[in-house]
Amino acid sequence: MESNHKSGDGLSGTQKEAALRALVQRTGYSLVQENGQRKYGGPPPGWDTTPPERGCEIFIGKLPRDLFEDELIPLCEKIGKIYEMRMMMDFNGNNRGYAFVTFSNKQEAKNAIKQLNNYEIRNGRLLGVCASVDNCRLFVGGIPKTKKREEILSEMKKVTEGVVDVIVYPSAADKTKNRGFAFVEYESHRAAAMARRRLLPGRIQLWGHPIAVDWAEPEVEVDEDTMSSVKILYVRNLMLSTSEEMIEKEFNSIKPGAVERVKKIRDYAFVHFSNREDAVEAMKALNGKVLDGSPIEVTLAKPVDKDSYVRYTRGTGGRNTMLQEYTYPLSHVYDPTTTYLGAPVFYTPQAYAAIPSLHFPATKGHLSNRALIRTPSVREIYMNVPVGAAGVRGLGGRGYLAYTGLGRGYQVKGDKRQDKLYDLLPGMELTPMNTISLKPQGVKLAPQILEEICQKNNWGQPVYQLHSAIGQDQRQLFLYKVTIPALASQNPAIHPFTPPKLSAYVDEAKRYAAEHTLQTLGIPTEGGDAGTTAPTATSATVFPGYAVPSATAPVSTAQLKQAVTLGQDLAAYTTYEVYPTFAVTTRGDGYGTF
């Protein structure tokens, strides 16, 4: 097979060689192919300054596979000066359907997105163009909750290079502990990519704990003109007990009567001001101040325009979500509970307005930990580009508001959702994607049970990776793959737990994936509202014909197989060191056969 690593002028033996040589001769740019991509320029002739700043690169998707630089370069040249173009190539000499173009400044990049998105490059072939995100931030899960920021920063510098900063958020319930994960900022995308490769499961442990590593969700930038009119503050790291009245009093202390209203949800809040000047003054005065025993972080909330809304909307929501088309201006709110996951905080003027089809009870109710109007953060890339490559999937078309997550006493008018699971059929294309974490309400569900069992047995935090596929009725379906860090580190060849069915709802897919993982591990999920975590080994004596004398006694794989033969509940054995390997290598569903 031909190597995908080429060097030289990048033209010899290529398709449209004559046209490409004519392009290079006309512009004076270099054209070199290496590591599966063909690079045009970078830098261009006569460029004697530093490379363009971050935000100057765009992603161009939906390219016809037989389209090359001789067609794309002239199109981009009309918009601005090209610093560099990188076209992804396959072994056959065709492009992979996408390319990256870096312009000399941000304004040219913005103009290119506006002019080229949905541009008809050929008859019936429309381009998909969005901003490219040069991601320099990694998500690292499985960190002991007792570790401080300085300790995490020091440890990350020991195991990876190019670490610039570490972002750690305190637990909502206990501010002396972290949330079990951190965001690590690197000096460049390359440094972050090298660190991600080094930190893959099984290679590195932190403080003796297996870790989970992935790209952090890239932050969407809001233009300066839009931010200059914002008069709403986002306040995080509040105590759960801190009231809206207490927040309003604190912010009004800077200028009495400046606050219009406060909306607090869990450990964060939005503070609305009558004018921007008062908001900025309060932000400068109160950012970092201790309120009710907790140092708070105060920033300007980020609004989203119509284009950004459409780009992020896929018409999917959480449990009991209804999709409704609206004729008034499009806008939405990102669920701020995910801001600690790296997602931006957005607000909208309609955020706290009642939607016409919502029926509010006579008695006073409350909002749950989700916003009135929200949509999952979906990072799907054109042409199945791997996660973290660039940009967000531009969907175009009409926008919809996906509203969900209302607390007790609120009802959504419409047909009752029919829960249904769909078979994972051969040939279905599963696309990696991220989403807002949906927190179960009221009862303890399978994801909570799985997390508690993993914590109890020091297996690390379960990592959920969301995939989607299009069903036979053209409906978007969802499936989560689950990775347990301890199992992955002990058995690098083992694939993530993959359930056999997809769901039309994201939260249902996550619940089913957790249930499937528990079942694969031999842990029952029935009656799981309390005490469903893995029992200690001392409870093993309740199983007839098999008793484990103490928690320190070794348990062999043969003994566990005997327990399976006797039909015993394996949950009693999950605390033993041999159990993870036994469970994965002996159970079905693609992980082995009994």
UniProtKB/Swiss-Prot annotation:
GO terms for molecular function: enzyme-substrate adaptor activity; mRNA binding; single-stranded RNA binding. One of its GO terms (biological process) is negative regulation of nuclear-transcribed mRNA catabolic process, nonsense-mediated decay. Keywords: Cytoplasm, Endoplasmic reticulum, mRNA processing, Nucleus, Phosphoprotein, Repeat, RNA-binding. Isoforms 1 and 2 are widely expressed while isoforms 3 and 4 are restricted to liver and small intestine. The keyword Ubl conjugation does not apply. It is found in: Nucleus; Endoplasmic reticulum; Cytoplasm. Residues 56-134, 136-218, 231-303 form the RRM domain. The modification Phosphothreonine is found at residue 498. Residues 359-408 are annotated as: Required for nuclear localization. InterPro entries: A1CF_DSRM, ACF_RRM1, HnRNP_R/Q_splicing_fac, Nucleotide-bd_a/b_plait_sf, RBD_domain_sf, RRM_dom. SUPFAM superfamilies: dsRNA-binding domain-like (SSF54768), RNA-binding domain, RBD (SSF54928). GO terms for cellular component: apolipoprotein B mRNA editing enzyme complex; cytoplasm; endoplasmic reticulum; heterochromatin; mRNA editing complex; nucleus. The RRM domains are necessary but not sufficient for binding to APOB mRNA. Additional residues in the pre-RRM and C-terminal regions are required for RNA-binding and for complementing APOBEC1 activity. Part of the apolipoprotein B mRNA editing complex with APOBEC1. Interacts with TNPO2; TNPO2 may be responsible for transport of A1CF into the nucleus. Interacts with SYNCRIP. Interacts with CELF2/CUGBP2. Interacts with RBM47. Essential component of the apolipoprotein B mRNA editing enzyme complex which is responsible for the postranscriptional editing of a CAA codon for Gln to a UAA codon for stop in APOB mRNA. Binds to APOB mRNA and is probably responsible for docking the catalytic subunit, APOBEC1, to the mRNA to allow it to deaminate its target cytosine. The complex also seems to protect the edited APOB mRNA from nonsense-mediated decay. This is APOBEC1 complementation factor. The gene is A1cf.
